[in-house]
C-alpha cells in the first residue's frame, strides 16, 4: 500500500506531503530552523529583561551572539574547497569582525540620535538579530553542499571514545580549578593533565583510524581544558594584563558606551576587550569576570585547531598533531594567554589570515581581501599582534621578491605547491606591496589617527634607533635568556637599584613635601629577593634523589632543553626545506616565506634593544608557532634521522611528548623540586603576584566608598590593576594607582597592601621588562601612617 505522502497520484496536502506522524515533511526537515527561531526569541527576552536563568541563560546568550551566527556562515557554499575546521576558522573570524564593527557602529551612530547608552542590552540584541537575519538570508542563497550530519555519522567508535575522554578532561579541569579556589589541593587538576597526556599519545597512535574532523574536536577539547585550568583560578579577575583589560572593559560596560578619551591608553583602543566583552555581557548577564574566564577561552580554544589545519596543508597527520602539542605545550599558551584576552582574539584573525594566504583553490583577489579583512580584525583586537604580523608579512614579501635572484640551477620549483609548480607558482603570490601598504594604513589609521594610541610603538622605534647608534644602552627582558645564545643580564638587585634611582629622579622633580622625607626613606632597605622557592620533593622525587638523580635541577634542565631544543629544531627544519630537496615535497612558497618572516620577527625582538621589554619574546614565539611548529617537528625528526626513518619518527614523538609533560607542569608536580604553577597550586610566584583574594576585593570596595579617595590618591603594588576601582558606580579612567615602593609613598595617600605582601613580606615591581621581587619594609608605613583597614588579607594605611 502506498501512503498519500508517497503516492504521486494522490492529492497534495497543504504545507507539503504528510509524514506518518501527521505533520508536513517540511516541518520535519526544518525542525532545526524552528528550534533556532524559538531559541533566538528566548535569547532576546533574556537579554533585554536580564531575567537570571543560571547556566542556561549565559549559554543561550553566547549561542545567540557567537555560536549560531558562526554556524550559519560555516554552512554556506562561500567556503567551498575548505574543510570543516577551516570553515570554522573563517566563520568565527568573520562573526567576531562583524561584532566588533557592528558594536563600533552602534557606539558611533546612536549617541547623535539621542541614545546615550548605545551598548545597552536592547541595541546589542538588535545587532545580534540583524547579524543572524543577514547570515540566514545569505545561507539560503548560498547553501553548503556537504552536511554536518555526514560528519556526525562518520565519528566511529574510536572517535567517540577520544571525544568522550577529552570532554572528561574539560570537566576535570573545571572541577580542579574550583577545588583549588576553595583551598583544596590540585590532585584533580593533575589527573586532568594526565588525561591530556594520554589522549595526546592516543591521537598519535590512532591517527590512521581518525578523520581530521575528529582529531580537531579532540584538539579543541584538550586545548580548552588547559586554558580553563588557568583562567578559572580565583573567583575574581586573576592574572597580569587581564587586570587592565578588565578595567578598560568595565569603563565601557558601566557607561554602555566606548570612549577612547575616557582612558587614553592603548588597552582602551582594543575593541576586543571593550566593545566585544560588553556585547557578551549584555546578552549573557553572567558575572562579568566570567566573560573573560569562560567565553573568551571557548573561542580561543579554536586556535590550536586552526594551527593543526595550517599544518595539514603540507604535512602528514603525525607532524600536524605534534605541531599542536608543541603549540599548546609552550608555557605561554596556558600560563599567559588566558590573561591576555586581547591577544587571544587577535590570534583568531591571525589563523584565518594564514589559511587564506595559503588557500590554493581561491583566486588571488579573494585571498587578498580575506587577508586585509583579517588584518582589520587584528588591529581592532590587539596592536602588538598586528605589528608583529605586519613585520612578518613584510619580511615574507621581501623573501618572495628576492627569490627571483636565486640562481636558476637552485630555483626550480622550490617552495611551490606541487599543483602550482613552474610559472603558476609566481601567479599564486598573495603578498604584494599593495597588500602590505593597506595593512600598514589600517594599523596607522586606527592606532594613530582614530585613537591616538600609537605613541608607544613610535617611542619604541626611537629607543631602538637610539640604542643602535650608541646614545643609550638599551634594555632587554629577562626572557631572552631562553634564546640559543643567551646573554648575562643584570642581577635583580642591580635592576632594583636602577628602579630606585629612577624613583629618586621622579622625587627630584616635585616639591619636597610631596613624598615622605628622604631621611625616613633611607632608614628602610629593600633588598631584592633572588630565586623562587621550589616545591618540596614528592615521594617519587625523593626516590629519584636517593638513586642519585638531582631532581631539583632536572626540571630546570628539561625546561631549558625545551626552549633551546625548539629553536634548534626549527632551524634544522628550515634549513632542510631551503637546501635539502631530494626526495622531499617542499611546502608552499607563501608558507615558507611566512615561516621566515615569523622567525625573523622573533629574532629581531630578541636581538634589538628595548623591543624585548615591550614586545614579549615568548608571546612572539607563541605567535610564530602557528606557522613554524610543523617545521619544528620535521626538524626534530631530521635531527634523529641517524636512528633510521621509522625510529626517528617514534623518537621525535617521544621527545615532543616528554617535553609536553614537563612544560605543562605534570612532571614537576609529580616530582617536586620546581616552582609551583598557578594552575596546580595555591602557592608560587604567579599565585603571590597575580591571584586576587576575596579580602582584597572587600578592601577595594570599602576604599571606594570613602570620601575624597581619588583626590588624595591610592598607592598599591601596581604591576597589575587589581586594586583599581572597577565596579560600575566607581570606575573611572582618571584613577591612577601609584606604586608602593618606599621612595614613592606620599604623606596623604591611601596605601593598600595585598594578601601576598602581608603574608610573605614581599612586593614586586616591573622594571625594564623584568619582574623583580623585594622585601617590603612594613615599618615605613607603621612609622608614617595609620592602619585604617585590616581584614586579614588586605591592609589599608592612611
At which residue positions do the language-model features occur?
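Membrane-embedded, hydrophobic transmembrane alpha-helices
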Residues: 1-12, 19-213
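Transmembrane alpha-helix segments characteristic
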Residues: 35-44, 214-224, 371, 570-573, ...
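Active-site lumenal/periplasmic loops and adjacent helix-entry segments of GT-C-fold
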Residues: 55, 61, 182-184, 203-217, ...
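Hydrophobic/aromatic-rich transmembrane helices and adjacent perimembrane loops
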Residues: 62, 66, 188-195, 343, ...
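Membrane-interface junctions at the ends of membrane-embedded or membrane-associated helices
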Residues: 74-90, 137-146, 208, 359-367, ...
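Membrane-embedded helix bundles of polyisoprenyl
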Residues: 91-107, 132, 172, 218-227, ...
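Membrane-interface helix-loop-helix junctions at transmembrane boundaries of multi-pass membrane enzymes
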Residues: 154-155, 205-209, 364-365, 407-431, ...
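Extracytoplasmic
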Residues: 297, 313, 455-527, 532, ...
